[in-house]
Amino acid sequence: MQSKTGTFPSIETRNLEGRAFRLPTDFEGDLNIIILAFQRWQQDIIDVWAPHLDALAARHTGVCIYELPTLANRYRMVQRFIDGGMAAGIASREARERTLTIYTDKRRFLAPLGVTDESTITLLLVDRQGRVVWRGSGEYSSATLASLEAAIASPTP
């Protein structure tokens, strides 16, 4: 399902290179593709999406991609271990720079985004003001990619 509603909540985090971010203010694109993941195995879904999203961003100026593994607050005390393990497993510096782990009260974080299903990944297209202008989820499909590209090509004001 591709719908558009919601606002990205304000949250502080770091990427896997250690750079601090205050989101959504620090999203760098005019439009930002946000990949929310909730379980380790969902990285396999992201890995299938990644080359398609990279190609899409390359075709559209001002589009940036961010991966946001989203974990409950209780994991914050082992944040260095989790982030270090993720960073060690990602060879690409670019991928580490765009991966920002979120440690938070997931219900409070996900509610404004309209995300209720953590059984798969969620894809969001977020503008500079933090507005969600498109939403999709799940395994890669050419139809979902086409819907995302259409939203990028003609964003709503």
Report residues per predicted region.
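Short, internal strand/loop/helix patches
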Residues: 66-68, 81-117
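Thiol-/selenol-based redox modules, centered on thioredoxin-like
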Residues: 111, 118-157
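Short, solvent-exposed coil/turn elements at secondary-structure transition points
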Residues: 17-19, 71, 105-106
